[in-house]
């Protein structure tokens, strides 16, 4: 929560739109990437090392950004538009209200663009996209029908040899969200980044720290927000204390980065899985 994933994703969108994200062979002595040869006048030049993978722009990018609502999409869209207006990409990326035109080479009005997708705005769903960005996938569930939208966009990207990326707060393990399905997947081609405090912080007896313990909670927050200079831990802890008065598990998920079931759970975490026949057999 409040780590700045929206602006970070916006930067990734810019890269997917006009950056050297497509494999262009292996570098030899003297090879380099020059922005001025790719429509950008920022003057940046990158000299490749021999044997290094080289990159090129996608010739006809079609990118979609998805979230649960317009307000949620705006967490990425606002910084994206600001980056374009205040940086060197304003000649390559042209905001047009509900979409952003990418100055490309295909000349196809249905390509070379960045679109926004929400539960209520799915008109471009099913398009052959090359990159998809999903925000707050911990809220995409079967009940709100966002799992279906999520998988449809994933299929569209896969068909074009594209990629997808998710950002989210820690999910509720009782909801079987898109984020949970991705986290639990065993596929080796999925990169997952999650600072799990329970793997790094333990008591002498091996038990995880308690979020109810003030000293241990502070250590959890310091670990989770390490490297985020813009975060004030005192402010985060104050918000935690207030939220814990009404929903302690939500405070642990949002700020402690822990996978904690909501207050309405009918079983403690791990109890059902631990009683599965295979688990009992392995413990015997």
Where are the language model's segments positioned?
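Phosphate/NTP-binding elements of NTP-utilizing enzymes
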Residues: 1-284
